[in-house]
Amino acid sequence: MSWLTPALVTIILTVVKAIVVLLAVVICGALLSWVERRLLGLWQDRYGPNRVGPFGAFQLGADMVKMFFKEDWTPPFADKMIFTLAPVIAMGALLVAFAIVPITPTWGVADLNIGILFFFAMAGLTVYAVLFAGWSSNNKFALLGSLRASAQTISYEVFLALSLMGIVAQVGSFNMRDIVQYQIDNVWFIIPQFFGFCTFIIAGVAVTHRHPFDQPEAEQELADGYHIEYAGMKWGMFFVGEYIGIVLVSALLATLFFGGWHGPFLDTLPWLSFFYFAAKTGFFIMLFILIRASLPRPRYDQVMAFSWKVCLPLTLINLLVTGALVLAAAQ
């Protein structure tokens, strides 16, 4: 088999890893809709889904069947090409961003030297998806929702990036594996970069448009915002894309601030690395759901004021202090 060169083997393994990670993330995003409803029911002293299968475990299958058989309707007054393109970008950009997440020491799709920058590039594409959805729907509520979402996402992505610059300054690299290795050799970044962690988790909730930062799709004000004209699988792609965003931000929180796959007993039980990563990611996913269950939605102007009046000073102070400490250590 002379044709099976080392380069070809590397390509095949990368493709297989990408497919496995892609399917796992999509399945996790879909399952999260059931998990969220069960947890919300538990915290609100009610049952949640409990009719389809034991503990409502087959509710996801019922929802998928319903979604598949709904009419894939495109409004006659919409820009059909852009209307169809928007959910593809919304879901696809977040799936591609998962390529830079190192799940275990040996498992990950891409080991990029610009890993964090690649994440910001893919996250920035979701703004286009929201804008395309609102503009192409030719609906005033959809347009208002997309304008809200664009302003909110662009604002909070600034602080999402600034909150990680302290980590980059300490490690001296944008590579995700280098960041995890630095935490293994020294200390998890939740301690020296606590203010960066606080800003990142707030901005992460905002850019995923999760409650209490779900003003772009506020049902009471905008009748579901930029989703309003979508139905069937197009709406389903937006829906699953939102949960994929939650999984992505949770995985980044675990990787950047809590050591990723790092934990005790890895020398004797290396398979625990995946368990540690999954447990840390699952904790932050539950935190996202708990935030939705416990906090009220503020006004839109309060959300934007909070970003520039609270998050901006916090991230700048964190970055300046980190820079000063790095320079002092280098002397």
Curated annotation (Swiss-Prot):
Catalytic reactions on record: a quinone + NADH + 5 H(+)(in) = a quinol + NAD(+) + 4 H(+)(out)
Molecular function per GO: oxidoreductase activity, acting on NAD(P)H, quinone or similar compound as acceptor; quinone binding
Membrane topology designation: Multi-pass membrane protein
Any one Gene Ontology cellular component term annotated for this protein: respiratory chain complex I
Top-level EC class as recorded in UniProt: translocase
GO biological process: aerobic respiration
EC assignment: 7.1.1.-
Residues forming coiled coils: none
Protein's cellular compartments: Cell inner membrane
Transmembrane domains' residue ranges: 7-27, 81-101, 114-134, 154-174, 187-207, 238-258, 271-291, 310-330
Keyword Transmembrane helix: yes
Keyword Ribosomal protein found: no
Keywords of this entry: Cell inner membrane, Cell membrane, Membrane, NAD, Quinone, Translocase, Transmembrane, Transmembrane helix, Ubiquinone
Family designation: Belongs to the complex I subunit 1 family.
Subunit details: NDH-1 is composed of 13 different subunits. Subunits NuoA, H, J, K, L, M, N constitute the membrane sector of the complex.
Stated role: NDH-1 shuttles electrons from NADH, via FMN and iron-sulfur (Fe-S) centers, to quinones in the respiratory chain. The immediate electron acceptor for the enzyme in this species is believed to be ubiquinone. Couples the redox reaction to proton translocation (for every two electrons transferred, four hydrogen ions are translocated across the cytoplasmic membrane), and thus conserves the redox energy in a proton gradient. This subunit may bind ubiquinone.
Protein name per UniProt: NADH-quinone oxidoreductase subunit H
Organism: Pseudomonas aeruginosa (strain ATCC 15692 / DSM 22644 / CIP 104116 / JCM 14847 / LMG 12228 / 1C / PRS 101 / PAO1)
Name of the gene: nuoH
